[in-house]
Amino acid sequence: LIQEIQRNLTEGRLDPESYVGAYYERIKRREAKVRAFITLRPMDEVIEDVKRSVERLRSGRHGRLEGILIAVKDNISTMGIRTTCGSKMLETYVPPFDATVIERIRREGGIIVGKTNMDEFAMGSTTETSYFGPTRNPWDLSRTPGGSSGGSGAALAAHFAELALGSDTGGSIRSPAAYNAVLGLKPSYGTVSRYGLIAYANSLEQIGPMARNANDLEVLYSVIAGPDERDATTVSAVLEKKEVRLNGLRLGVLDDMMEVSEKPVKSVVNDVLNKLSSEGSELKEVKLGYLDYALPAYYIIAMSEASSNLARYDGVRYGYSSGEEGLWTDVYSINRGAGFGWE
């Protein structure tokens, strides 16, 4: 738990050098094969950040994430830290500003350790379409970590960081969380600001937290959530933490989803449902009846918005430039052909 780390730092049982060094030793030992990061901050910079956090912890004036190392998906803008979207098109891009979620993390004392690998422009589900090479699952290097936030999921599973941020359009947080045996949340649309997210499908994409336990997930979510005047899609309602008792809680179970799930998945879900039922929850089967249209609708929206959003990367205004000269249509085609991958 992040509270335990903060307590150990405050009381001196954990010093900044050994604390940060333990993460970087794991990264040094395994990163060459896992490839969770695109950009990793120098260890000495991170140690200095932690030293400042320890001072604030001991003064009693500290944030909720004080001193905690966080991995950030590489489509979330971080001032002064390269942000590539896993693409040659943005290979050298260093944002001059922070995304709102990064501002909030920094304000609460969180420390960015690096930017994680991802499917190019978040279009993929295996983290294999990155210009920087594929990420592997730390539990089994022959397997995928899921995607498109596979680098964030892998970084958590390998204990390269304590918390992580991902983005989710059609499963890009939830899939890596499941594949890497960690936790991930796609927040309800509008609860987390998307300002500074390099999105490919604005109507669907959300930034969300990832962690190794529910307590830490809740803390990170509470930090990044909330209205933002720079994102008109955020909701103005104040988010409140509520205690929910399982006894008497009414839960819907999507029957049509269970019908198409594989046996191992059904087994795990049924185990959870039985546990909830034994705790006094009321389970009600729900059949939506229109799930056959969900995936086609998703692809129509996502691909339409992707074609619009990615049109700006032409090598003239934004993105990789081949340096070729000629008719503008030819130059656009050459730049985009060289800057984008096959996905």
What are these regions, as identified by a protein language model?
Residues 79-92, 158:
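DPxDG-like acidic metal-binding loop motif
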Residues 61-84, 111-114, 118, 276, ...:
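Conserved small-residue hinge/capping positions at short loops/turns
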Residues 97-224:
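Short glycine/serine-rich loop segments
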Residues 1-48, 278-280:
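An N-terminal boundary/leader segment
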Residues 65-85, 246-254, 304-343:
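Short helix-loop capping/hinge segments that flank enzyme active sites or metal/cofactor-binding pockets
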Residues 43-66, 72, 91-95, 105, ...:
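Flexible, acidic active-site loops/lids enriched in D/E/S/T/G that coordinate Mg2+ and/or position polar
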Residues 186-267, 325-334:
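A short helix-breaking turn/cap at a secondary-structure junction
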